């Protein structure tokens, strides 16, 4: 259903001439509404920063909190739609209607530099013209807005559950699990929350504080747990996890003591993008990304003194410092360097549609704390196989090609002809360890009386031993490196594979020979006698010792 909505005339006392002119020229706002619409998580239309707020006397704490709520994307969109005021039966004194008018006036009916005064409906029940805790005012405002919604729902639907747009946006579920250490039985309890308090007494970062929240607590002695299965008090462990993540996450850094109000003024780092998945009771699927959009800051020694201000991210993506009537632009670096009191994050379920964009290609790098560790492990364990089967055509697909007889003399001529082409490749190939092994093998071969073979090499004018690693023969030649005494191979070189042809591809590194697929099979059976190497018709075997 498509509904055309127009905003009512603003209060002249709170509107500047420029704002009135803007309202006269403003077109109607069209939004799509359905019966079961959920609050949007992003700005429907990019908006600039809201106007400054007048300090009526020690009211900086409520101004800072109202600015954060005004720039909460799903709440602002719901307020700008004016959906609630159209169904409210008693708009006078209604906190939801007052907040709707405040957000509409701040974002739509004001010019840059305008200042407005917060409605007394939002402030009178809490503000007594003295400094108060901004977080307490924030939670008081959300609870009273929630109650206003429930009154309307109960009048229209008496059987409806205690749900409201406020809980749909800010609400989540805690899961408290108690486990009996004797019978291992568990008991789960679920509680709603609107904010997540974080103990920062020993935490260096928000992520560490979130982990500390989930630490197991032992229940013993007077605090022992009564187990229904054991039917008596037993030692138990208690853990607390976020079971259902809210659309908007409020993280409250516990800087003030409960009794004296003294402040814990220590630096706690917080990210611009946060992945909440590791902190859920049942983490499944991919990352659960959140983006920072507002920060509430306190300067001073106690919560009842000092000064409050806030940073907000406007609908068009720019950051602003909201300090009562002053609205100044800033960068995200300034925002992340503050000693924050309350952090506001919005869930990003669809990165392509959310206005507070996070680089989609860097999501795992930014959000997943284990991504870099997993990436480094994959690189460490990924090793390239020394086998040459990955070069050229796979062995199972290679065709058996006919070969012709080639003499050593012809091989020498062809080698010298192609030596220049293959020289560059051989210079870049590290064969020093192989050449040392070949020298050792050569000494063993001499001890096994293979002088006739060496004399034959001298007659042909070619020293195969000096050309190991750079022998370049025609594609139809077959070269076999076969030591005379195979039985002594494993005992003489225990660090090598006990198959001489296993290293044949290391002895000949010429790319041309590898691509022909005519090297001897590495997986072949071990041959113990030289006489078994018989020449097939049309082939010339070169036995290299």
UniProtKB/Swiss-Prot annotation:
Catalyzes what? Thiol-dependent hydrolysis of ester, thioester, amide, peptide and isopeptide bonds formed by the C-terminal Gly of ubiquitin (a 76-residue protein attached to proteins as an intracellular targeting signal)
Could you state a single Gene Ontology molecular function term? cysteine-type deubiquitinase activity
Whichever gene encodes this chain, its name is Usp17ld
- The answer to whether the entry has keyword Protease is yes
Q: Which UniProt keywords apply?
A: Endoplasmic reticulum, Hydrolase, Nucleus, Protease, Thiol protease, Ubl conjugation pathway
Look up the record and report any one GO term of the cellular component aspect: nucleus
Q: What does this protein do?
A: Deubiquitinating enzyme that removes conjugated ubiquitin from specific proteins to regulate different cellular processes that may include cell proliferation, progression through the cell cycle, apoptosis, cell migration, and the cellular response to viral infection.
Instruction: Enumerate composition-biased segments (Basic and acidic residues).
Output: 393-404
Keyword Cytoplasm applies? no
Write down the species.
Mus musculus
Its domain of life? Eukaryota
Q: Where is the composition biased (Basic residues)?
A: 374-385, 524-537
As for subcellular location, the record says: Nucleus; Endoplasmic reticulum
Q: Where is the active site?
A: 60 (nucleophile), 307 (proton acceptor)
Where's the USP domain?
51-348
Annotated SUPFAM superfamilies: Cysteine proteinases
The reported effect of residue 60 to S is: Loss of deubiquitinating activity
Q: What is this protein called?
A: Ubiquitin carboxyl-terminal hydrolase 17-like protein D
EC number(s): the record gives 3.4.19.12
InterPro entries under this entry?
Answer: Papain-like_cys_pep_sf, Peptidase_C19, Peptidase_C19_UCH, USP_CS, USP_dom
| Tissue/organ expression | Detected in T-cell, myeloid, and embryonic stem cell lines.
């Amino acid at each position: 259903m498509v509904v055309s909505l127009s905003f009512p005339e603003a209060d002249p006392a709170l509107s500047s001439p420029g704002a009135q002119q803007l309202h006269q020229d403003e077109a109607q706002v069209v939004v799509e509404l359905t019966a079961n619409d959920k609050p949007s998580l992003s700005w429907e239309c990019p908006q600039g920063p809201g106007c400054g707020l007048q300090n009526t006397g020690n009211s900086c704490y409520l101004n800072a909190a109202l600015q954060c709520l005004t720039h909460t994307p799903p709440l602002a969109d719901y307020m700008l739609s004016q959906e609630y005021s159209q169904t409210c039966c008693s708009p006078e004194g209604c906190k939801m209607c007052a907040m709707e008018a405040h957000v509409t006036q701040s974002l739509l009916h004001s010019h840059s530099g305008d200042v407005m005064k917060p409605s007394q409906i939002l402030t009178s029940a809490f503000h007594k013209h003295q400094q108060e805790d901004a977080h307490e005012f924030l939670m008081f405002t959300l609870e009273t807005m929630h109650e206003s919604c429930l009154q309307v729902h109960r009048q229209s639907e008496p059987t409806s559950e205690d749900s409201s747009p406020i809980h749909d946006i800010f609400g989540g579920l805690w899961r408290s699990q108690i486990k009996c250490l004797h019978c291992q039985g568990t008991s789960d309890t679920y509680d709603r929350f609107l904010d997540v308090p974080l103990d920062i007494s020993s935490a260096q970062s928000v992520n560490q504080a979130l982990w500390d929240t989930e630490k197991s607590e032992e229940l013993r002695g007077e605090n022992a747990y009564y187990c229904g299965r054991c039917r008596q008090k037993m030692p138990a462990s208690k853990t607390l996890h976020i079971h259902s993540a809210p659309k908007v996450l409020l993280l409250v850094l516990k800087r003030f003591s409960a009794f004296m109000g003294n402040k814990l003024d220590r630096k706690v780092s917080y990210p611009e993008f946060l992945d909440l998945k590791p902190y859920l009771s049942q983490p499944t699927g991919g990352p659960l990304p959140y983006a920072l959009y507002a920060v509430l800051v306190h300067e001073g020694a106690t919560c009842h003194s000092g000064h409050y201000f806030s940073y907000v991210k406007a609908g068009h993506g720019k950051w602003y410092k909201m300090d009562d009537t002053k609205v100044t632009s800033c960068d995200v670096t300034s925002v992340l360097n503050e000693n924050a009191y309350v952090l506001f994050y919005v869930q990003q379920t669809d990165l392509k549609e959310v206005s507070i964009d996070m680089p989609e290609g860097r999501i795992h790098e930014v959000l997943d704390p284990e991504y870099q560790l997993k990436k480094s492990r994959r690189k460490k364990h990924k090793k390239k196989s020394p086998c040459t089967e990955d070069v050229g055509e796979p062995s199972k697909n290679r065709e058996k090609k006919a070969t012709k007889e080639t003499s050593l003399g012809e091989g020498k001529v062809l080698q010298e002809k192609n030596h220049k082409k293959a020289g560059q490749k051989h210079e870049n190939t590290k064969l020093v360890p192989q050449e040392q092994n070949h020298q050792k093998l050569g000494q063993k071969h001499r001890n096994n009386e293979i002088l006739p073979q060496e004399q034959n090499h001298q007659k042909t004018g070619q020293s195969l031993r000096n050309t190991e690693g750079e022998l370049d023969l025609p594609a139809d030649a077959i070269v076999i490196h076969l030591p005379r005494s195979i039985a002594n191979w494993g005992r003489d070189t225990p660090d090598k594979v006990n198959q001489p042809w296993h290293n044949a591809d290391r002895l000949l590194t010429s790319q041309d020979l590898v691509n022909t697929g005519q090297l001897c099979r590495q997986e072949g059976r071990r041959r113990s006698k030289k006489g078994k190497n018989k020449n097939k018709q049309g082939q010339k075997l070169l036995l290299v010792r």
